[in-house]
Amino acid sequence: MYTPPAFKVQHPALALAFAAARGFGLMVSCDGGRPLASPVPFLIEERAGKSPRVTFHVARPNPLAALAERRGTWLMAVSGADAYVSAAWYTSPDQVPTWLYETVHLSGPVAVVPAEHARAHLDALTARFEQGIADPWTTDKVAPAKLEQLMRAIVVIEMLVEDIEGKFKLNQHKNDADHVAVASQLMAEADPAAQTIAARMVALRPQLMYQNPAGVALAALADSGDM
């Protein structure tokens, strides 16, 4: 991923935490000259002295399921909030429009997880995303025969993370006046993603004076994506 130094996430642990908190990304591979990709929920397991492990599953007919048998190197692209920035928002002249965003790329070799571990994967995945639900769903709520049928319909895949790239493009290269102008405008937008980007920008330079006409809860937004 092309990443100018100003936007690079310097600490891999922060980029990994961002991806883990998101828990949803685009898994990308290549079958010869044809790219293949599937959006998937996933779990990240950090292991002492070993590469982090990403686990996810796809439907058995998904071409990625067969491709995983070849144990190639794949890439998981994990995106957070993003927002358009108009050139009219800057205080400095001769600016151009841009897009601000946060993204992390994880890459490494993949392998198919043995079928006997499918239920443990589903249990861990659902436990992660059922947090906060009053009556959380578990695999125990499915009849055993039906659950076996469903598990046979998926293929669990793991990726050992060998490379972590993080890019948070938040106008870090702009002067304070432009930083404040853009962040303040994004706060006023109705789009929650724009407000999240504004909160990230404020967190980068909290000492500056921002306009927050919408009364956006910046602290909560800034904490929602693991800066």
Locations of the language-model features?
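Short, basic/aromatic recognition patches
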Residues: 2-26
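A generic local secondary-structure boundary/capping motif
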Residues: 16, 94-95, 146-149
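Short, intrinsically disordered, mixed-charge
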Residues: 20-21, 69, 76, 123-131
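Short beta-strand segments
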Residues: 21-60
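A generic structural signal for short beta-strands and their flanking turns/coil linkers
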Residues: 23, 38, 50-54, 70-74, ...
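Residue-level recognition of well-ordered beta-strand positions that form the cores
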Residues: 41, 57, 77, 109, ...
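Short, structured beta-strand-loop surface elements
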Residues: 60-121
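C-terminal edge-of-domain segments
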Residues: 113-227
